[in-house]
A protein has these predicted regions:
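Substrate-binding clefts and catalytic carboxylate motifs of secreted carbohydrate-active enzymes
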Residues: 181, 202-204
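C-terminal cap/loop subdomain of S1 sulfatases and analogous C-terminal strand-loop tails that border
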Residues: 39-52, 56-57, 75, 82, ...
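Charge-dense polyanion-binding interfaces
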Residues: 172-194
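Short small-residue beta-strand/loop micro-motif enriched in glycine and branched aliphatics
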Residues: 74-78, 160-164
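A long, amphipathic alpha-helix that forms part
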Residues: 1-29
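Soluble non-cytosolic domains of exported or imported proteins
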Residues: 3-10, 80-87, 106, 170-173
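Histidine-centered active-site microenvironments of extracellular/periplasmic hydrolases
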Residues: 18-73
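Non-transmembrane alpha-helical segments in soluble domains
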Residues: 10-17, 21, 90-97, 113, ...
């Protein structure tokens, strides 16, 4: 996003939050700012094109901004590295509303209210995120990402995913094996989560 785009975005979000304050809703309103997909493949960052953006199974294709304003839960200004998925939104809204979903309702996500409060049990935090488009699948944790083509990347050292980590790397083997084991749980012929959706370009990477 250009500096001009960031300025416009910041102003509009600030205006929305300010309106809630004027209406006296600040103490009981949750504001979530996010996006529905990664950066546009035709976009630029600091004058350089985005690598593997929207529509592609790469971190920059699925990783989106996620900013939450919840003054009744925390003072704000906190940056969290917790892995959050869109499936977590519904359970979170139910949690804040004090609604307990029926046991017969299967939910893929979980409430991230503990993360907002800053008291999430480290042993209960999500440790990986799975994504799929067509027959192309990938899984990532906080720092690494692997796909069903065998490509493994260190997102801290290589956010553009241009350098594949060698299987002989002394630091990464444990991470690679763990993520590969989780990815292997999904059958190779597993259908997309939404069978009614058929990607025009399945398997872009």
């Amino acid at each position: 996003m250009s500096s001009h785009g960031r300025t416009i975005c910041k102003c509009r979000v600030k205006k929305t939050a300010g309106l809630h304050d004027e209406l006296g809703l600040k103490g009981r309103t949750l504001i979530v700012f996010t996006g529905d997909n990664g950066s546009a493949s035709s976009g630029t960052l600091n004058g350089e094109p985005y690598p593997k953006g929207k529509g592609r199974q790469a971190d920059w294709g699925v990783h989106v901004p996620f900013i939450v304003r919840a003054p009744f839960l925390n003072k704000g200004g906190v940056v969290s590295r917790d892995l959050i998925d869109f499936t977590d939104l519904y359970p979170t809204f139910l949690d804040l509303a004090g609604v307990t979903p029926p046991k017969t309702l299967k939910l893929d996500g979980k409430s991230f209210v503990p993360s907002l409060r800053g008291d999430e049990d480290p042993f209960k935090k999500r440790s990986w995120i799975y994504s799929q488009i067509g027959d192309f699948r990938m899984i990532r944790d906080w720092y690494h990402i692997i796909d069903n083509k065998g490509a493994f990347h260190n997102l801290l050292k290589d956010p553009r995913q241009e350098q594949k980590v060698s299987p002989q790397d002394k630091i990464a083997p444990g991470r690679r094996q763990r993520l590969q084991m989780i990815l292997d749980r999904f059958p190779k012929n597993a259908p997309a989560p939404f069978p009614e959706f058929k990607a025009k370009h399945p398997g872009l990477n």
